[in-house]
Amino acid sequence: MAQKERSERDERESEFVDRLVHINRVAKVVKGGRRFGFAALVVVGDQKGRVGFGHGKAREVPEAVRKATESAKRGMIYVPLRSGRTLHHDLEGHHGAGRVLLRSASAGTGIIAGGPMRAIFETLGMQDVVAKSLGSSNPYNMVRATFDALKRQMHPRDIAAQRGIKYSTLQARRQHLVDAEG
C-alpha cells in the first residue's frame, strides 16, 4: 500500500521541472571556529503556466536544494499565457532595489533574459519573452521582482470586465494596434 502511494506521489512530482538558480555558502562563527552551511534558491514549474520559487538552508548542498524545492512547490502561482507561449501585456516588477521589465514577444523570438529570469521562464513554459533587469543583480531580488511582475499580469477578459467593456472590443483594439505596428 505504501509502495503504491509513493509511486503515485513520484508521478505527480515528476511533472515539475526544477532549476537551481543560486547556491550560497554561509558561515556561522562559533567558539570552536566557523560552522559552514549552504543556502539554495530553486525555481520549480510545470511548463504549463505554474511556477514557484523556494529558499532552503542546510549543512549540506543536496539537503538545502531539497528544502528549497519543497518550498517552491508549496508557493506556486499560476500565470496566464497568451497562446501558451508569451505574456498578455508588458509588465514591471520590484523587490528591494531590484527592478525587472518584462515584454511580450512575437513568435520565434525565444527567451531573451539573463540568469535567474531565464530559469523562471523556462520552468513556466514561456517560449517568447524579452526581459531586462534594472537595479540590483542579486538573484534573490531578481527572482522576487520577476514574480512580483508575473503576479500583476491579467488576462484580457479580466481587464475588459474591470473596464466595463466587452472582451471582443478589447481584442479588436489590440488587433488594430498590432496591425499598425506591422
UniProtKB/Swiss-Prot annotation:
It holds the Pfam family Ribosomal_S5_C. HAMAP family: Ribosomal_uS5_B. Part of the 30S ribosomal subunit. Contacts proteins S4 and S8. The N-terminal domain interacts with the head of the 30S subunit; the C-terminal domain interacts with the body and contacts protein S4. The interaction surface between S4 and S5 is involved in control of translational fidelity. Belongs to the universal ribosomal protein uS5 family. The gene is rpsE. Keywords: Ribonucleoprotein, Ribosomal protein, RNA-binding, rRNA-binding. The lineage of its organism: Bacteria, Pseudomonadati, Pseudomonadota, Alphaproteobacteria, Hyphomicrobiales. SUPFAM superfamilies: dsRNA-binding domain-like, Ribosomal protein S5 domain 2-like. GO terms for biological process: translation. This is Small ribosomal subunit protein uS5. With S4 and S12 plays an important role in translational accuracy. Located at the back of the 30S subunit body where it stabilizes the conformation of the head with respect to the body. One of its GO terms (molecular function) is structural constituent of ribosome. Residues 16-79 form the S5 DRBM domain. One of its GO terms (cellular component) is small ribosomal subunit.
